[in-house]
Structure formats: C-alpha cells, structure tokens
From Swiss-Prot:
GO terms for molecular function: ATP binding; ATP hydrolysis activity; ATP-dependent protein folding chaperone; unfolded protein binding. Residues 560-634 are annotated as: C. Molecular chaperone. Has ATPase activity. Belongs to the heat shock protein 90 family. It comes from the Bacteria. This is Chaperone protein HtpG. It is found in: Cytoplasm. PROSITE patterns: HSP90.
Length: 634
C-alpha cells in the first residue's frame, strides 16, 4: 500500500463549488460526456509530453509508447482511466483541480444563464471538463506524477465533489495520471466493458492516441484466469491525415468538440490536404456560437499546430488574420521545423503562404454556407458578423470576397434584420443605378425614419441601413463592390445621376436660383453653426436636414474617437431645406429678423435630432420651442 505524506485538506474556490453544483444538476441528461472530457484531457497530456520531450527526450523515461487505458471493477463499482502523458505535480494538481483559471472565472460565472444547453456549451469552452466526472461519481481519486520528477513526488488528490478536496504526496513509479471514479449507485452501468466501448466509439474515436480496454475473454472452467490483455478500441489515427471520403460527419463533429472545447456541433468545416511546393493538412471549423471573449482582440486565438503529426502548440495565431479569430481547427505541416516557436512563426515566409491559402479556404467555406444553407449563414452572421466586418480594413487582397459575405438591413423591408447581401441589392437595383446607397446611424428606428430617405422612398430606390458601431469605419475601407461605388446618402451634395430625369435637374436648378435670397438669410441667422446652407434635393416631407461635408467624420466615427479619448477634428454640418415645405414658405415670408433667427435655430436643432445627434445647447432649444408654443396658443 502506498504511504501518503504531507496530507492536507483544502477548500474549493467558490466558483468551483458553483460549477460542481451546475455539473451535477444541469448536465445529468448528457452524462456520457464525462468520459469524453477525461479522454480529451488525457490526449492533451500526451500532446504536451511529446512537445516537451522534443527538447528533453529523457522525459519519456524509456516509455515513448503513449496511450490511454480504461478499466472497470464491477464489484467495487469503479471506472479507472490512466494515461502516461505529462502528468501533474502537487502544485499542478492544486492549481488545476481546485480552481478554475483566474482569467476565465469571472467571465464564466457572468455568462451562466440557467439554460442547460447554453451552460453546457460554456463548460466546454472554459476547459473545466474534469469536473464532469462528478455527474456519475460521488467520489473521485486522482493519482499523478509529472514526467521528470522522482517517483517519491507523486500526488494523490481526492474529493467527494462537495466543498473540499484532500491532497497527499505518494510514491508513483509510473509518470502520468490515473483517475478512479467511484460510481454513484444509479450509475453502475458504466462499470461495463461494452458500455465503455460504445461511449469511446461515439465520442472519442477520433483521438489520435490509442484508447485501450481489457480484452473481453472468459476462462474455461478449471483453467487459470488468462493474463490481462489490452485491445485498442478507437481508430487511433490523426483524423486530419485521413482521406475525406473515409471520415463520417459524426467523426468531424466529435473531433471539433474535442479541439474546440464545445458541446455543440460546428456550422461547417473544411478538410484539405495540400501537396506540391508546400505540404500540409488542414481541418478548419466554423463554430455555431460566438465565444465569450470574441470582441477581446487580445484574447488567445488560433489553430492547433502540428509538425509531422507532433503537437507543437495551441493557439498558433499566425495562420489566420484577426478578423477570422473565431475559426477553430488543426494545421499539420511537413515543411516547418519541430523546434518552431511563436517568434519564428511571425517571420517565416512559409507561414505567409499558408496563411493566404487558409484564409481563402475559410472565405470559400463561408461563401458555400451562405449559398447552400442561408438559414445557417443567418445564424453565423448574428454571431460573427461584426467581427467579419473588420476584414476589409485588415485584408485588402480579399476585400471583394469579404464584401460579398457581408449582410445589411435595408429599406427593402421593415424587419431590421441584417439579411441583404450586396449581390442581392444590385440584382434589385433600378435601371440606370450605378451606385450602392447606404445610411449609417445609431439605431434601426432612427435610420429607417431618417429624412435622408425621403427622395429614395419616392423614387423606389433601395438604401442599406447600417447601425452597428463599426459600420462607418467599415465603409471608409469599402469603396466599391462589383464596380459600383458606395454612396453615403447623408454626405455631401446628393447626385442621383441617371435616376434624376433632365426635368428634375432643371427644376432643381430653377428652385436653387429662386431661393438664393432665403439661403443668404439662413446663413446670416445660423452663422457659425453651419458650414453651408443650400436647397435640398433629398427632402419631400421634412422641412430641413443636416448633411455631412464630403471629407468630414460622421456621427459614429466621432463617437468612437470621443469614447477612446482621441481628439475629434472640428466640423460643421451643411443645412439643407425643403423649399416646398409650408414651414419654409412661412419662414421665407417672415418680416421680423429676430423671429426668423429663432425659427431657423429651431429647424436646425430639429434636423440635428433627426440625424441622431445631440444638441450642443438643449436648454436654448427648449426655450425657443416654448416661446413658439406660447405664441401659437395665444
């Protein structure tokens, strides 16, 4: 019997207690996953040992045949999972099995919803799958020793999954980790060879490490019990090295769950073998749901990197651009050196070639998803659309391709849903329309009721409605699509080109000439508040509108700069008025210059509010409006 020394009882971190409660009560219906999670951890431990042994071969301790062994004892009601991977020291055990990584703790608890399906997804995402053992076990013992440490520095961790755990130092001649699950009374079904085999085949067939179970054999009466033999029950080959025709969808899905720490199936995947100048295999996945840290651009991201089937690193970020940071997967290269580092990855020209090809592969996969499964793409867009919008600024070479994947709300319907592709917009364009018209704003309600749309509604011209915070910044990088220029309908002097008839243009010129006097009066009244005053071609129903100067920053960009503490360049709007509106006609006939100025400022402030802007002096606006209301009610 192993002698235990330095025994201590420690309390679980508060979050672990909550997590254990959640595991036991919320994931009961999907209890088989405990085995998948423990096998996944054992596989990672083998990967880590292989990687560390590249520099220190002595860590193999004469045993480089890495494997996972599963056994059971019906009488004792236990299931044991053993690996000869990297193993854990006493410090590792306390850190990994007593706490959740500090960086993820707050986010994890904040993201819990009470919805079992969603929460099970989070558990995988935060790499806390070990605790799923308590779904089926009322006590768990872990025996481990880190590779390279003396046999006397083994460690025994034990817990009933309540509030505390025990840790003791033990002798452990073999490196690696052995986990013994003491099954609950109603979970004894798992102490069975066929049951364990089925779960392994279902969830872990893709694991590249051999998963072994004792061979099922019975001794003939009178004969000795045969020596225990082990048989491998999974394929034990790297899934990404196999031919696509050999791999079933279910295998791709389970492999994704393993590498993506996700409980949901992926939306799409792309598996490729590249031969020729460069040789590598890639298997790339689009997740179904956004991770909690998607908008933290510094968060760890990237693909699992293997070189000649040897695991090198997680989160190798050099293979895909930042705007595709949600993609999960594996890349296995034959051309890179086994001692490759993150620093080398950033400078290696081979990586640049692979990055170009892998980026194209992802964009092709998204195009295919959008074309063949529009409903699934709609889900993708809801989760990842805002991140994809970073693409045109980061990836000039693929700008047109990315633009084709973007989705927008538009005046085509009143749903406010971002479902319109640029290709769809152009297919519906009016005859003679050579521009793509759009309007940015704070919210869908604000832009859909904007006076800027009036002339477009009258002429039946569709306008894209852009309300994401990133949109104005995005459009500063998107100049055209399919040869058609983008036009912000709130910017500069609106020119509808062939969509305006010669009669329209002639009438506009005549009105502008006729209202020159009013233009000058308004300039005098509004003074430094405006850059220019002119007759509007945009309005049919509203009295006035504010347009942005051709080179000026729009409202969204100004707000982004202000929020980040940057200096915002000074700019003034252009005040446009509708000459046929009754208010403007009355204003034109106003004899009192003081009253003219008061009314002009009210119209200016109303136009600013309609544009979604805030007033520089709201009190002055209220005072003028109250004065006007008093006059009207007298």
């Amino acid at each position: 019997m192993t002698v235990e020394t330095q025994k201590e009882t420690l309390g679980f971190q508060t979050e672990v207690k909550q997590l254990l409660h959640l595991m036991i009560h919320s994931l009961y219906s999907n209890k088989e996953i405990f085995l998948r999670e423990l096998i996944s951890n054992a596989s990672d431990a083998a990967d880590k040992l292989r990687f560390e042994a590249l520099a220190k071969p002595e860590l193999f301790e004469g045993d480089a045949d890495l494997k996972i062994r599963l056994s059971f004892d019906k009488d004792a009601g236990t299931v044991t999972l053993e690996d000869n991977g990297i193993g854990m020291s006493r410090e590792d055990v306390i850190a990994h099995l007593g706490t959740i990584a500090k960086s993820g703790t707050a986010d994890f608890m904040k993201n819990l919803t009470g919805d079992q399906k969603k929460d099970s997804h989070l558990i995988g995402q935060f790499g806390v799958g070990f605790y799923s053992a308590f779904i089926v076990a009322d006590k768990v013992d872990v025996y481990s020793r880190r590779a390279g440490q003396p046999a006397a520095e083994g460690v025994h961790w034990s817990s009933k999954g309540e509030g505390e755990f025990e840790v003791a130092t033990i002798d452990k001649p073999q490196r690696g980790t052995r986990i013994v699950l003491h099954l609950k009374k109603d979970e004894q079904e798992f102490a069975d060879g066929w049951r364990l085999r089925n779960v392994v085949k279902k969830y872990s067939d893709h694991i590249a490490l051999p998963i072994q179970l004792p061979k099922e054999q019975a001794a003939t009466e009178g004969e000795e019990q045969p020596a225990e033999e082990w048989e491998t029950v999974n394929r034990a080959s790297a899934l990404w090295t196999r031919s696509r025709t050999e791999v079933k969808d279910e295998e791709y899905q389970e492999f994704y769950k393993h590498i993506g720490h996700d409980f949901e199936n992926p939306l799409a995947w792309s598996h490729n073998k590249v031969e020729g100048k460069l040789e590598y295999n890639s298997l790339l996945y689009v997740p179904a749901r956004a991770p909690f840290d998607l908008y933290q651009r510094e968060a760890p991201r990237g693909l699992k990197l293997y070189v000649q089937r040897v695991f090198i690193m997680d989160q190798a970020e050099s293979f895909l651009p930042l705007y595709l940071r949600f993609i999960k997967g594996v890349v296995d290269s034959n051309d890179l050196s086994l001692n490759v580092s993150r620093e080398i990855l950033q400078k290696d020209p081979i990586i640049d070639s692979m990055k170009t090809a892998l980026t194209k592969r992802v964009l092709d996969m998204l195009e295919k998803l959008a074309k063949n499964e529009p409903e699934k793409y709609k889900g993708f867009w809801k989760n990842f659309g805002q991140v994809l919008k970073e693409g045109p600024a980061e990836d000039f070479a693929n700008k047109e391709k990315i633009a084709g994947l973007l989705r927008f709300a538009s005046t085509q319907d009143d749903s406010g849903e971002q479902s319109v592709a640029l290709a769809d917009y152009l297919a519906r364009a009016k005859e003679g329309q050579d521009k793509i018209y759009y309007l940015t704003g704070e919210s869908y309600a604000q832009v859909k009721n904007s006076p800027h749309l009036e002339v477009f509604r009258k002429k039946g011209i569709e306008v894209l409605l852009l309300t994401d915070r990133i949109d104005e910044w995005l459009m500063s990088y998107l100049n055209e699509f399919d040869g058609k220029a983008f036009v912000d309908i709130a910017r500069g002097d609106l020119d509808l080109g062939k969509l305006d008839s010669e009669e329209d243009k002639k009438a506009q010129e005549e009105v502008a000439k006729d209202k020159e006097g009013l233009v000058e009066r308004l300039k005098g009244a509004l003074g430094d508040s405006v850059a220019e005053v002119r007759v509007s071609h945009r309005l049919t129903d509203s009295p006035a509108i504010l347009a942005i100067g051709e080179q000026d920053l729009g409202l969204q960009m100004r707000q982004i700069l202000e929020a980040s503490g940057q200096k915002v360049p000074e700019s003034k709007p252009i005040f446009e008025f509708n000459p046929s509106h009754p208010l403007i006609e009355k204003l034109d006939h106003e004899q009192s210059e003081d009253r003219f100025a008061e009314l002009s400022h009210i119209l200016f402030d109303q136009a600013a509010l309609a544009a979604g802007d805030s007033l520089k002096d709201p009190a002055a606006y209220v005072r003028r409006l109250n004065k006007l209301l008093v006059e009207l009610s007298a």
